[in-house]
Curated annotation (Swiss-Prot):
Binding site for substrate: 83, 89, 121, 152
UniProt record similarity statement: Belongs to the LDH/MDH superfamily. MDH type 3 family.
CDD domains for the chain: LDH-like_MDH
Superkingdom as given in the UniProt entry: Bacteria
Active site: 176 (proton acceptor)
Pfam families assigned to the protein according to its UniProt record, in alphabetical order: Ldh_1_C (PF02866), Ldh_1_N (PF00056)
Residues where NAD(+) binds: 10-15, 34, 96, 119-121
Functional note: Catalyzes the reversible oxidation of malate to oxaloacetate.
Any single GO BP term: tricarboxylic acid cycle
Annotated protein name in UniProt: Malate dehydrogenase 2
SUPFAM superfamilies: LDH C-terminal domain-like, NAD(P)-binding Rossmann-fold domains
Keywords tagged on the record: NAD, Oxidoreductase, Tricarboxylic acid cycle
Length: 316
């Protein structure tokens, strides 16, 4: 049986971690592409030389030509400029749209059957642009945002309650930006609603304040990392999140992962890429799980969807 092939477009911080994680998990042979000569070659050589230590056995190749991604089963796109302190994700749209156009054309030509996961920011616009240019079915072009946003939300909750992150289930909806919707009502610890546990610890009034602070921190979590790094944006957690999506596709795991997916009426949204819970399997984004939202949650979702629509409308 032939091994799967994973193509990574963009050899920066996220791309390097993606290559390492894909190799460590032996998800398939890895091709790392970047326009900078020597960068992807150096990173893949470095990772490959760790194989005898870490015990993985896959092929790793760095390249500066799209032809080398030919026949890839999965393509993960990280290419684009990262944020700097004070920038929003949306500030990147003009320059990263040009980069995504070139990338999508390369994918269309050399990996026409791939499942494409976009990480590049502004995410909701970039995944839309990628699908438009490739012309791939919507179920084969998705964006990584919700897995990361939900993981950040879960981490903050685990730290606050002093429990294992493994026991926290958190859900976020909407766009990957300041208007994302962390769903408190659907968030739990071993099945126990998170607000019950916070109220046991703090009382109702204080619990509400603590949760509001965690929701705010989740929405600004990417910016928090940017402000601390000063020279770039997060790369470990986005890479881990995208690898979870790729693995679910390659192994047909049917995992339910918050994903930037194309909606066709779900959540009252039609014809737009928005973050929602999605079953990811061998068919790509196989189906959307519809959640019943209360009035407050729906209002937040509507606001987030409007922000995504406004952003996508700026695409040339």
């Amino acid at each position: 049986m032939a091994r799967s092939k994973i193509a990574l477009i963009g050899g920066g911080q996220i791309g390097g971690v993606l290559a390492q994680l894909a190799a460590l998990r032996e998800l398939g042979d890895v091709v790392l592409f970047d326009i900078v000569e020597g960068l992807p070659q150096g990173k893949t050589l470095d990772i490959a030389e760790a194989a005898p230590v870490d015990g993985f056995d896959v092929s790793l190749k760095g390249t500066n030509t799209y032809e080398d991604i030919k026949g890839a089963d999965v393509v993960i796109v990280t290419a684009g400029l990262p944020r700097k302190p004070g920038m929003s994700r949306d500030d990147l749209i003009a320059v990263n749209s040009k980069i995504m156009t070139t990338v999508a054309e390369g994918i269309k030509q050399y990996a026409p059957n791939a499942f494409v996961i976009v990480i590049s920011n502004p995410l909701d616009a970039m995944v839309t642009l990628c699908q438009r240019i490739t012309g791939f079915p919507h179920n084969r072009v998705v964006g990584q945002a919700g897995v990361l946003d939900s993981a950040r939300f879960a981490a903050f909750i685990a730290w606050e309650l002093g429990v294992s992150v493994k026991d926290v289930t958190a859900v976020t909806l909407g766009g990957h930006g300041d208007d994302m919707v962390p769903l408190v009502r659907y968030t739990s610890v071993c099945g126990v609603p998170v607000m019950e546990l916070l109220e046991q610890k703090y009382g109702a009034a204080k619990a509400a304040e603590v949760m509001a602070a965690m929701v705010k921190r989740t929405r600004g979590a990417g910016g928090e990392v940017v402000a601390l790094l000063k020279t770039g944006s997060a790369f470990y957690s986005p890479a881990s999140s995208a690898i979870a999506m790729a693995e679910s596709f390659l192994k047909d795991q049917k995992r339910v992962l918050p994903t930037c997916a194309f909606l066709k009426g779900e959540f009252g949204v039609d014809g737009l890429y928005v973050g929602v819970p999605v079953v990811i399997g061998a068919g790509g984004a196989e189906r959307v799980l519809q959640l019943k939202l209360n009035a407050e949650e729906q209002a937040m979702m509507d606001k987030s969807v409007k922000a995504v629509k406004d952003l996508v409308a700026t695409l040339k």
